[in-house]
Amino acid sequence: RGLIDLGIDRVISGPGAVEPPAIVAAIDEIPPGSVVVSLDAKGGEVVVSGWTEGTGLDPAAAAARYEELGAGAVLFTNVDVEGQLAGIDRNAVESVVGAVDIPVIASGGVATVEDVVALKRTGAVAVVVGTALYEGAFTLRAAQAAADEA
């Protein structure tokens, strides 16, 4: 709540908040839509504790539940491909995007500008790119230009 009072628009609730009581508490304390729920998925299930502990939750179903509870957006990270320049799992992102009406930010596996475009076409409103930029696989300007044209 303190960050919102300072003028911060959104607060990301980390993957530890996969239990509904934790997210409900966070959502109840700040303005509607201000919580971005971070969902990390591995092997098709939401994971916590540094991606080591499965929860049994389907990412799309979890995203839909958090939307019902008042989350304003979802940051979806596919940790199967995170940081590996291995390419994206478009189907996983499409599943989460299709399950909710709130914005979805996609993360994990981006290796090429084409991956950025593909994620935009899933309906994701934003894409997190880390390793590809760090390793010089492409420039931010090139990714933005390609996404704008898509």
Task: Give the location of each predicted region.
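Catalytic cores of alpha/beta
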Residues: 1-10, 22, 91-129, 143
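Alpha-helix-loop-beta-strand connector modules within alpha/beta enzyme cores
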Residues: 19-41, 85-112, 147-149
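Residue-level marker of alpha-helix boundaries and capping positions
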Residues: 53, 83-84, 106, 134
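Short, basic/aromatic-enriched C-terminal tail that caps enzymatic domains
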Residues: 132-150
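Conserved anion-binding
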Residues: 1-82
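Short active-site-adjacent structural elements
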Residues: 83-85, 113-116, 135-138
